[in-house]
Amino acid sequence: LDNIVLNIKNLSFYYKKDSPIYSDFNLVLQKGELVSIFGKSGSGKTTLFELILGNLKSQNGTIEKSKISMIFQDPFNSFHPTYTIYEQISDVVQRDFKEELDKVLPKLNLDLEILYKKSYELSGGQLQRCSILRAVLQKPDLLLVDEPTSALDNIVAYDVMKLLITLLKDCAILLVTHDINMAKWCSNRIIRLKDADK
């Protein structure tokens, strides 16, 4: 039981009563597991994340979760343009992590100088790696990953997932994707969602 980082029981959610997005949905995630939520646009993938994060309230069921971090779909929306990457990571991590950077930055193909830049000065790939860095330094039990590769080309996309798996091997990862090949390649389990709201 100590290994369980996400436990969703009998979850029901709808925007319209006659079109449930989830009906008695159950999901258990353990440390080290990577589970992909696969489905088309409108099938409820992002809704599930909003429910887990507490941004939406379900009509029924319970969600028990451990410490969460998230990597967003658009790397350019992951950081505020007014502050440096370093300032924003510090604000979230809230501890001295300078020593950890020596180990993690080379694995992400980042250097310290990049962290003192602002988001508009960096490429999408660099920002996505900065998002991974932030997640790694947060040391979450559960990482929510929302289509992290959609803005990247195929080779870079797989590199990003390899980095996540390598650097967060003890963390459970819940990946939302519309790329079935990506899901098959990296997942322990795949959950297919139907177009519930269509």
Where are these regions (language model features)?
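Catalytic Walker B motif of ABC-type/P-loop ATPase nucleotide-binding domains
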Residues: L143-E147
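The feature captures the beta-strand-to-loop junction immediately N-terminal to the Walker
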Residues: F38-K40
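Hydrophobic anchor residue at the start of the ABC signature
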Residues: I132, V160
